[in-house]
């Protein structure tokens, strides 16, 4: 049975909740395509570009991981005057996928794995208070590493999203600026909650290593809760029928013809007849 009476147990619960929420947000942000969005007025469509999904308006979305086989550039004949041979390139149309999308995707996946291990570590530290020190150390490592990777992921995305070739959507006639979509803001919210998770994990470590009485109290309350649950479970089990003592000891008074031997009643309430023989007279 779950109990959260001590401060250590409450901080463990807060760490678990924040890690689960952060992991869910970054997972939802990763699988959705709205990291960069733009209105293509030439084609009258709302384009969403994600880390692995591309949704061109009302058309069906498709997943892509590499655009290396598609040539989006053409060389310009006019080169710079002072830099002979340094010919600029002209972007024909906006690529669906850049290499840094793949890097951000990998960082997000590793961050989700670390956050899941963080949740597992805090659960183990709650269930086994006597062996919680190793799990608390792992909790701090996984929580901090997940938050750091998510921060690096967002920085990589923001820096590359502001580049000229990925900031604008080249339409049929005009060029339209891309904006950040809800997926990006969900990832940012996940990072904020991951930082809160790191703070809660630090509090769990503080109470585990500096306040051993909190660990002892947590172990005691958890053990008492389990004992009470076992007693309550045993009381709820169906009990066998027990007839009253007055029914078991009921006797019929003697008559003028002799004494009457009453039938015996078993503990289950079944009637047992007794046979009279010549020794009874």
From Swiss-Prot:
It is a multi-pass membrane protein. It is found in: Membrane. InterPro entries: Clc_prot-like (IPR010761), PMP-22/EMP/MP20-like (IPR050579). It comes from the Eukaryota. Its main location: membrane. The keyword Transmembrane helix applies. One of its GO terms (cellular component) is membrane. Keywords: Membrane, Transmembrane, Transmembrane helix. Pfam families: Clc-like. The chain crosses the membrane at residues 13-33, 104-124, 137-157, 184-204. Belongs to the Clc family. This is Clc-like protein 5. It comes from Caenorhabditis elegans. The gene is clc-5.
């Amino acid at each position: 049975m779950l109990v959260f009476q001590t401060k250590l147990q409450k901080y463990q619960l807060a760490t678990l909740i924040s890690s689960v929420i952060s992991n869910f947000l970054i997972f939802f942000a990763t699988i959705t395509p709205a990291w960069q969005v733009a209105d293509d007025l030439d084609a009258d469509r709302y384009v969403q570009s994600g880390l692995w999904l591309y949704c061109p308006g009302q058309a069906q979305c498709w997943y892509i991981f590499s655009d290396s086989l598609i040539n989006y550039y053409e060389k310009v004949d006019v080169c710079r005057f002072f830099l002979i041979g340094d010919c600029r390139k002209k972007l024909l149309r906006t690529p669906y996928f850049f290499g840094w999308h793949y890097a951000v995707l990998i960082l997000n996946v590793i961050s989700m794995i670390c956050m899941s291990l963080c949740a597992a570590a805090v659960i183990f530290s709650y269930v086994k208070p006597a062996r919680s020190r190793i799990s608390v150390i792992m909790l701090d490592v996984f929580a901090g590493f997940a938050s750091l990777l998510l921060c690096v992921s967002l920085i990589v995305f923001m820096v590359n999203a502001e580049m000229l070739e990925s900031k604008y959507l080249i339409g049929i006639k005009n060029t339209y600026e891309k904006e950040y979509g809800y997926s990006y803001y969900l990832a940012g919210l996940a990072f904020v909650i991951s930082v809160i998770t790191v703070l809660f994990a630090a509090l769990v470590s503080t109470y585990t290593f500096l306040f051993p009485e909190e660990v002892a109290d947590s172990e005691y309350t958890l053990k008492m809760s389990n004992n009470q649950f076992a007693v309550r479970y045993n009381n709820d089990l169906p009990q066998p029928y027990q007839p009253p003592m007055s029914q078991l000891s009921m006797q019929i008074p003697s008559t003028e013809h002799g004494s009457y031997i009453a039938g015996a009643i078993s503990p289950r309430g079944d009637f047992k007849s007794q046979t009279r023989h010549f020794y009874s007279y």
